[in-house]
């Protein structure tokens, strides 16, 4: 499976277009099925950024909806949260996408954007906000207590 790695900065042109980094385009094309949009863009619920999902990953994200009663408030709320602000987007020949105005406003994008790889997905940020988020993530990740490979409880070697 192709993954999205690194942070890349590109200019947003006057028409609202931005070039997807080449490595990200390659990963998206490797995952896209014929006739599908290249990527699904949606506002993050947690951060002032745009989430970018390969179509198959977005479909997997929506699978929990299948477990809810289709006519319930919970289903309607989840469907609205997932789909109402989601935009399927294709790139032009130069690898550029057009960012919808509502998403640009959500992420406070003006003239430059930062593409931040997250493995299976990526995010699109205002560059200074992306740097702050990366610093915050590094700090918080140091506080996570992940079990070491090959170690027993108490820190003794296996």
From Swiss-Prot:
Residues 133-158 are annotated as: Disordered. GO terms for molecular function: DNA-binding transcription factor activity; transcription cis-regulatory region binding. Residues 7-57, 86-129 form the SpoVT-AbrB domain. Its main location: cytoplasm. It is found in: Cytoplasm, Nucleoid. SUPFAM superfamilies: AbrB/MazE/MraZ-like (SSF89447). Pfam families: MraZ (PF02381). GO terms for biological process: negative regulation of DNA-templated transcription initiation. Keywords: Cytoplasm, DNA-binding, Repeat, Transcription, Transcription regulation. The keyword Methyltransferase does not apply. The keyword DNA repair does not apply. GO terms for cellular component: cytoplasm; nucleoid. Signal peptide: none annotated. Gene3D superfamilies: Transcriptional regulator MraZ domain (3.40.1550.20). Belongs to the MraZ family. Forms oligomers. PANTHER family: TRANSCRIPTIONAL REGULATOR MRAZ. This is Transcriptional regulator MraZ. It comes from Gluconacetobacter diazotrophicus (strain ATCC 49037 / DSM 5601 / CCUG 37298 / CIP 103539 / LMG 7603 / PAl5).
């Amino acid at each position: 499976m192709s993954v999205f790695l690194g942070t890349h900065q590109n200019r947003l042109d006057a028409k609202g277009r931005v070039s997807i980094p080449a490595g990200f385009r390659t990963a998206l094309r490797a995952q896209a099925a014929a006739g599908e949009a290249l990527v699904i863009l949606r506002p993050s619920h947690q951060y002032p950024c745009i989430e970018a999902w390969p179509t198959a990953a977005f479909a997997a994200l929506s699978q929990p909806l299948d477990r809810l009663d289709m006519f319930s408030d919970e289903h309607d709320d989840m469907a609205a949260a997932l789909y109402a602000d989601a935009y399927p987007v294709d790139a032009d020949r130069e690898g550029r996408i057009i960012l919808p105005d509502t998403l640009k406003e959500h992420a406070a994008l003006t003239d430059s954007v930062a593409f931040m790889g997250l493995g299976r997905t990526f995010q699109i940020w205002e560059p200074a906000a992306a740097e702050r988020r990366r610093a915050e993530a590094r700090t918080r990740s140091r506080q996570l207590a992940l079990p070491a490979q090959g170690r027993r409880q108490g820190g003794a070697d296996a």
